């Protein structure tokens, strides 16, 4: 049964999606995908049978319930079944279709042929096991914010993408006109996915520089400072990094932050204010929000 995989299905409140993705990634799953069923989300993920016992799956189910209770959301329902390897390779992909985002962008799965008769910016993507297919509200909010921001900026900009996942935000930024993006993620699979998607979108590696690590590695990697930051990760991780944003950015820099539930917005805003950042706009979608912030130049 070495070629068999567990297909894990999590039925959950849509506002739990990012937390479930994070938990499945930490558990070791690959090829995550989401579809909407009524008022709920169904998240599918896959893990080799040889590495995972039934007790492990039961523990995963418990952790997912605990994660939901911490944010006062309904308990998710987790189920699993064994499938053959060839079924795994195609099963999750059939649920992911092209996604239009903002006024100018469309996310196209790598295994589909993109249109040639469109003025839209096409971001081709194969996320592998990394987070970021463009279907989650936080990813969409970040891309829409980037579209607005990079349309406003007449001068070439250099950005930092902290927690790059599949590379979707970095690639979107380059295709929207950013001159250079430095992308980091602590997960080596995310680093690999971002590099693969960089190649898929024919982006020069000198324009999108990808490394394993977090903000500390960026501070060592970047010669000088960046014009902007984009960061779509868990709110508590963002909170811990805010004090380091100043050293990373120029005096008139901006940042786009998401992965944040509405109920987490106030502590994030308070921490930003303590470190001389101004909230220019707070965009909301469902129970998620996206901070558009700038340095306080006064």
UniProtKB/Swiss-Prot annotation:
<comment type="function">
    <text>Methylates ribosomal protein L11.</text>
</comment>
<keyword id="KW-0489">Methyltransferase</keyword>
<keyword id="KW-0808">Transferase</keyword>
<dbReference type="GO" id="GO:0016279">
    <property type="term" value="F:protein-lysine N-methyltransferase activity"/>
</dbReference>
<keyword id="KW-0949">S-adenosyl-L-methionine</keyword>
<dbReference type="GO" id="GO:0032259">
    <property type="term" value="P:methylation"/>
</dbReference>
<dbReference type="Pfam" id="PF06325">
    <property type="entry name" value="PrmA"/>
</dbReference>
<dbReference type="InterPro" id="IPR004498">
    <property type="entry name" value="Ribosomal_PrmA_MeTrfase"/>
</dbReference>
<dbReference type="GO" id="GO:0005737">
    <property type="term" value="C:cytoplasm"/>
</dbReference>
<feature type="binding site">
    <location>
        <position position="139"/>
    </location>
    <ligand>
        <name>S-adenosyl-L-methionine</name>
    </ligand>
</feature>
<keyword id="KW-0963">Cytoplasm</keyword>
<dbReference type="InterPro" id="IPR050078">
    <property type="entry name" value="Ribosomal_L11_MeTrfase_PrmA"/>
</dbReference>
<comment type="similarity">
    <text>Belongs to the methyltransferase superfamily. PrmA family.</text>
</comment>
<dbReference type="InterPro" id="IPR029063">
    <property type="entry name" value="SAM-dependent_MTases_sf"/>
</dbReference>
<feature type="binding site">
    <location>
        <position position="163"/>
    </location>
    <ligand>
        <name>S-adenosyl-L-methionine</name>
    </ligand>
</feature>
<protein>
    <recommendedName>
        <fullName>Ribosomal protein L11 methyltransferase</fullName>
        <ecNumber>2.1.1.-</ecNumber>
    </recommendedName>
</protein>
<feature type="binding site">
    <location>
        <position position="185"/>
    </location>
    <ligand>
        <name>S-adenosyl-L-methionine</name>
    </ligand>
</feature>
<feature type="binding site">
    <location>
        <position position="232"/>
    </location>
    <ligand>
        <name>S-adenosyl-L-methionine</name>
    </ligand>
</feature>
């Amino acid at each position: 049964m070495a070629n068999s995989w567990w297909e894990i299905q999590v039925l959950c409140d849509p506002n739990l999606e990012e937390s479930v993705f994070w938990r499945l990634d930490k558990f070791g799953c690959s090829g995550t995908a989401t579809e909407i069923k009524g008022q709920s989300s169904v998240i599918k993920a896959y893990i080799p049978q040889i590495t995972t016992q039934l007790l492990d799956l039961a523990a995963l189910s418990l952790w997912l319930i605990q994660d939901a209770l911490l944010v006062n959301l309904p308990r998710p329902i987790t189920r699993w079944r064994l499938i053959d390897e060839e079924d795994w390779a195609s099963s999750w992909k059939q649920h992911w279709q092209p996604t239009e985002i903002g006024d100018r962008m469309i996310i196209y799965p790598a295994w589909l042929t993109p249109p040639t008769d469109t003025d839209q910016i096409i971001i081709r993507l194969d996320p592998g096991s990394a987070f970021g297919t463009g279907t989650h509200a936080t990813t969409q909010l970040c891309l829409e914010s980037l579209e607005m921001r990079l349309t406003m900026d007449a001068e070439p900009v250099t950005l930092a993408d902290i927690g790059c996942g599949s590379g979707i935000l970095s690639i979107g930024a380059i295709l929207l006109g950013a001159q250079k993006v430095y992308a980091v993620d602590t997960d080596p699979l995310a680093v690999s996915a971002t590099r693969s998607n960089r190649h898929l979108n024919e982006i020069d590696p000198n324009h999108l520089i990808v490394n394993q690590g977090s903000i500390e590695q960026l501070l060592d990697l970047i010669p000088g400072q960046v014009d902007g930051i984009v960061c779509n990760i868990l709110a508590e991780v963002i909170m811990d990094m805010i004090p380091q944003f100043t050293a990373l950015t120029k005096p008139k820099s901006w940042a786009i932050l998401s992965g944040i539930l509405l109920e987490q917005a106030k502590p994030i805003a308070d921490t930003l204010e303590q470190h001389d950042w101004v909230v220019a706009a707070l965009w909301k979608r469902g129970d998620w929000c996206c901070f558009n912030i700038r340095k306080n130049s006064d």
